[in-house]
């Protein structure tokens, strides 16, 4: 019987659904029980629907030109599940596509090829020790960090969210904070179950038992009283930004290290993961994760500087409003920021361009920067006007940045889009530090203008989690390694 085109399409779709459904329990088990995060060309598959798994495979076609069939990637997923692996992020798409279409196996069987590609985490004796984490503050970034840490919860969770610290509130405070975790106007509902234990001051979320501690100062807490020790304190309040202030956390019993989710002053290391994360030493007790804008632009600037050289440039950020601004006109100590955030474009300053030099010293003194706050609640854009050392063209520059996004050591920081229809809301929840909008790239000789989107909340929070892992000495490699 000859099938009609419609019947062929329906049969093909049902087959893809079938394989996606078979993949789901393997992906979930690998993540929960062994700490292995499966993705396809950077798109995470943990907790993904069958439709999301199918869509992730379309990404391969977009970037590589050839199809990766779900039945092909399913075979490789079964091999991964059969191996004794340490926690890692494994790109199933690159693994399968490399073997099937790029001859990366060099005559090896599929199993031997996978073993070779994953040998750095195969049959390793040493398992990472889990790190207790305390979120000091529970605002926009704090709640997104909580979502990310809860998402990673399981028997082999490397980062264990043990507590959040907030100022004392009135009756109903705990329910309100749990509700803010449960519902978010920008990022949508929490994916899971949240309950509150008022007697114990605990929020229970997807198997994570989160102690809520009420305190008025960072040096007044005994974390040992809650079974927490050697904790990494993630200060997301933005109140203390120097060594003296952040050092107060270390006076609390059970606290070991402090990470600030904002730019820091003085000699505190400003870390942009992917660029200078190896500067974090075991003896560093206080570190900062820089700003969302610095995280968005620095990886792209590093890649371009390494390949083309940068003489100088200007970075203009078109930034969503934040809760530092006023809802309606009122007094603010900063110029213009007192005007209604949701009604105005507000010209203001940013230290992001100068802060790049803290992570990338070779660009010190080469960049200027300014910012425009705009009436959108999330997702921002950096426009980088650069004078390069070498002449190039838009095609060459975009091809290079696509390769950076797919195959370089910055592939977890730099994303890439060639869509002519993408707008800011499409990028809410994007897990990369920045997304290069290739259709907007302008190049003439050695002058280049690049447009880089970034989710200034969620993408930044993902970078913060990576810095947390670095501070905890947790190895979580992305495999296969960059080509």
Residue map of PLM features:
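Short beta-strand-to-loop capping motifs
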Residues: 166, 386-390, 452-454
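Short pre-catalytic strand/loop immediately N-terminal to key active-site residues, enriched for Gly-Thr
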Residues: 284-288, 447-452
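Generic C-terminus detector
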Residues: 448-454, 463-483
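C-terminal substrate-binding/catalytic lobe of Rossmann-fold NAD(P)-dependent dehydrogenases
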Residues: 2-57, 307-309, 313-446
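N-terminal Rossmann-like NAD(P) cofactor-binding subdomain of oxidoreductases
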Residues: 2-326, 334, 466-467, 474, ...
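A generic structural signal for alpha-helix starts
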Residues: 295, 391-392, 458-459
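Glycine-rich phosphate/pyrophosphate-binding beta-alpha loops
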Residues: 373-377, 453-460
């Amino acid at each position: 019987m000859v099938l009609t085109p419609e019947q062929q399409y329906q049969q093909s779709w049902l087959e893809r659904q079938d394989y996606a459904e078979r993949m789901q329990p393997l992906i979930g088990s690998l993540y929960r029980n062994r700490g292995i995060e499966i993705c396809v060309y950077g798109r995470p598959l943990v907790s993904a629907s069958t439709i999301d798994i199918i869509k992730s495979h379309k990404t391969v076609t977009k970037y590589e030109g050839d199809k990766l069939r779900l039945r092909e990637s399913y075979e490789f997923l079964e091999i991964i599940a059969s191996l004794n692996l340490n926690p890692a992020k494994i790109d199933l798409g690159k693994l399968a596509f490399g073997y099937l279409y790029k001859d990366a196996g060099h005559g090896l069987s599929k199993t031997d090829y996978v073993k070779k590609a994953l040998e750095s985490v195969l049959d390793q004796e040493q398992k990472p020790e889990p790190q207790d984490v305390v979120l000091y503050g529970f605002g926009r970034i704090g709640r997104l960090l909580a979502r990310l840490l809860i998402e990673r919860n399981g028997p082999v969770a490397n980062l264990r969210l043990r507590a959040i610290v907030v100022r004392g509130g009135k009756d109903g405070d705990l329910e309100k904070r749990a509700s803010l975790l449960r519902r978010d106007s920008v990022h949508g509902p929490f994916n899971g179950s949240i309950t509150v234990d008022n007697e114990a001051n605990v929020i229970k979320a997807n198997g994570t038992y989160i102690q809520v501690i009420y305190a008025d100062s960072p040096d007044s807490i005994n974390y040992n009283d809650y079974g927490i020790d050697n904790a990494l304190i993630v200060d997301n309040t933005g109140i203390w930004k120097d060594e003296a202030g952040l050092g107060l956390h270390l006076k609390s019993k059970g606290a070991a290290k402090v990470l600030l989710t904002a730019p820091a002053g003085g000699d505190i290391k400003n870390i942009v993961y992917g660029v200078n994360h190896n500067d974090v030493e075991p003896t560093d007790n206080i570190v900062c994760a820089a700003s969302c804008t610095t995280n968005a632009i620095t990886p792209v600037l590093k890649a371009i500087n390494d390949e083309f050289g940068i003489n100088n440039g200007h970075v203009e950020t078109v930034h969503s409003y934040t809760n530092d601004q006023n809802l309606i006109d009122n007094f603010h100590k900063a110029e213009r920021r007192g005007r209604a955030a949701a009604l105005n474009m507000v010209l203001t300053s940013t230290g992001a361009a100068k802060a790049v030099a803290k992570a990338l010293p070779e660009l010190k003194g080469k960049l200027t920067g300014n910012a425009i706050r705009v009436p959108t609640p999330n997702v921002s854009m950096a426009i980088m006007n650069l004078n390069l050392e070498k002449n190039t063209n838009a095609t060459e520059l975009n091809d290079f940045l696509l390769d950076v996004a797919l195959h370089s050591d910055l592939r977890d920081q730099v994303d890439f889009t060639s869509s002519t229809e993408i707008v800011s809301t499409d990028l809410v929840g994007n897990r990369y530090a920045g997304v290069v909008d290739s259709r907007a790239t302008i190049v003439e000789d050695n002058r280049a203008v690049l447009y880089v989107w970034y989710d200034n909340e969620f993408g930044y929070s993902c970078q913060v989690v990576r810095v947390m892992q670095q501070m905890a000495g947790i190895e979580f490699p992305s495999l296969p390694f960059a080509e």
